[in-house]
């Protein structure tokens, strides 16, 4: 069930404070955050936010298309290891 429109978007206070400060200074340095649950708001457009994926901080440049989505959507947490193929079929194809 989606969040009520009466409440508005959720953004952690500490993250919003850093966003406001970066906009005042015109800083291009990435803002480090662990808050994957925060929603992207129009004030963040043009900033680079380093989102934690459980292991490291992934730098993400915020564009207008991202507004309304959660930060966690842009920093994947799982790495895909390809399934091992049929070795016998590979060897026959090489011959």
UniProtKB/Swiss-Prot annotation:
Query: PROSITE patterns per the record?
Result: RIBOSOMAL_S19 (PS00323)
Tell me the SUPFAM superfamilies matching this sequence. Ribosomal protein S19 (SSF54570)
Keywords assigned by UniProt?
Answer: Ribonucleoprotein, Ribosomal protein, RNA-binding, rRNA-binding
Q: List GO BP terms, alphabetically.
A: ribosomal small subunit assembly; translation
| Domain of life according to the entry | Bacteria
Ribonucleoprotein keyword on record: yes
Q: In the UniProt record, does the keyword Signal occur?
A: no
Family matches, as InterPro entries = Ribosomal_uS19 (IPR002222), Ribosomal_uS19_bac-type (IPR005732), Ribosomal_uS19_CS (IPR020934), Ribosomal_uS19_SF (IPR023575)
GO molecular-function annotation terms?
rRNA binding; structural constituent of ribosome
Q: What GO cellular-component annotations does this UniProt entry give? A: cytoplasm; small ribosomal subunit
According to its UniProt entry, the function of this protein is described as: Protein S19 forms a complex with S13 that binds strongly to the 16S ribosomal RNA.
Q: Which family does it belong to?
A: Belongs to the universal ribosomal protein uS19 family.
Name assigned to this protein: Small ribosomal subunit protein uS19
What is the organism field in this record?
Coxiella burnetii (strain RSA 493 / Nine Mile phase I)
């Amino acid at each position: 069930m989606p969040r009520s429109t009466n409440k508005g978007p959720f953004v952690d206070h500490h993250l919003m404070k850093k966003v406001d400060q970066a906009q005042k200074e015109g800083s291009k340095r990435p803002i480090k955050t662990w808050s994957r649950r925060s929603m992207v708001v129009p004030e963040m457009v043009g900033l680079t936010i380093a989102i934690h994926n459980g292991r490291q901080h992934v730098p993400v440049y915020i564009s207008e298309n991202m507004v309304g989505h959660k930060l966690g959507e842009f920093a994947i947490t799982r790495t895909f290891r390809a399934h091992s193929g049929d070795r016998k079929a590979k060897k026959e194809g090489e011959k």
